[in-house]
Amino acid sequence: NNVIAKPAEDTSIIGCEVVKIFHESGVPKSALKLVLGDKKIGNELTKNPLIAGVAFTGSSFAAKQINKNLADSNGPIKSLIAETGGQNAMIVDSSSLKEQVIDDVIRSAFLSAGQRCSALRVLYVQDEIADEYWDYLNEALQEYTIGDPNLPKVDIGPIINKNSKDRLLAHISALKKSAKRTIKHHHKQDKGDLFITPIVFEIDSINQIDEENFGPILHFI
């Protein structure tokens, strides 16, 4: 079977590099092809009768559209494997090593500005140690540097585009009204238009999060 890879339009360079690695490792170019473009290209691929199935990672909205396209296309029934709208979580109890846990939490939640499907979104902490971990998380987060990710000693970069930033700011605005307390990175707001300050919200329930937030936002429960 042949595979066509289509990365998100804003991550075309990464898509090219990943496919290049596969080709260099011995996968025939005829077996793995790369297509770049926006949602028009995605719609064409998922509606094409020659496509037997789709594997997709992204938003629930996009997955629903892909599923509809596959169902409406001509030919036999086609398969869809989708990973969407995830809220990756970590559970911390009193047996955990605080320094190691907090380092792992910050790296998972905030490196790449949280723009990874595997990024940590929710941190569950045992009640008895919640205040201790909250204070240590606040202290440790301030040690990370925000700026141009191409520069040395910079840990956290910008959001990929304005639409993503606007969605994140809307989520932050809503949570500010209901969060019990907040941790915010203390960097100056002069880095550029697409930077969002890493932020941690303590919330009462996972039900306060109604969608995946693809950015530097961590929810502490």
What spans do the regions from the language model cover?
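Structural motif
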Residues: 6, 35-37, 57
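Conserved small-residue-rich beta-alpha loop and adjacent elements
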Residues: 1-29, 99, 216
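Short acidic-hydrophobic, aromatic-tinged amphipathic segments that line or gate anion-handling sites
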Residues: 33-37, 92, 220-221
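ALDH superfamily catalytic-core signature
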Residues: 21-26, 47-48, 53, 60-206
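Short alpha-helical
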Residues: 10-13, 39-41, 60-61
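A structured beta-alpha segment of the ubiquitous adenosine-cofactor-binding alpha/beta core
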Residues: 33-52
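Conserved glycine-rich beta-strand-loop-beta hairpin in the small C-terminal domain of fold type I
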Residues: 192-197, 211-218
